[in-house]
Swiss-Prot record:
Designated name of the protein: UPF0299 membrane protein YohJ
NCBIfam families in UniProt: PRK01821.1
TM region positions: 7-27, 31-51, 63-83, 93-113
Cytoplasmic topological domain residue ranges: 28-30, 84-92
Keywords for the protein's UniProt record, in alphabetical order: Cell inner membrane, Cell membrane, Membrane, Transmembrane, Transmembrane helix
Subcellular location: Cell inner membrane
Membrane topology listed for this record: Multi-pass membrane protein
Amino acid sequence: MSKSLNIIWQYIRAFVLIYACLYAGIFLASLLPITIPGSIIGMLILFVLLALQILPAKWVNPGCYVLIRYMALLFVPIGVGVMQYFDLLRAQFGPVVVSCAISTLVVFVVVSWSSHLIHGERKVVGQKGTKK
């Protein structure tokens, strides 16, 4: 019985911590003069707490595993909600596709530049000497 209670406690603790970060993010979003979704701020709060090791990762792992396991199911309501605006999406299909393509390219360039900035130029494995 003690093992079962321990497992239940781990799941409850994980979800309480995840939701505490979410609601802290929602609260901070309501105070900020710019529009940033509270869920994004909550994720950043959780990331900072984990990165600074203020919050041990083992405390949130059980809840994260459950959320990741059922992630596809969690997108179903969002897909149904988007279908309510099908006519609007069909009318704006071109601009949506163009903005998605451009933003994807911008992300590729920024990640590539950041990676080169952080890691510097390294010799590729199997590559002979480079001419400079």
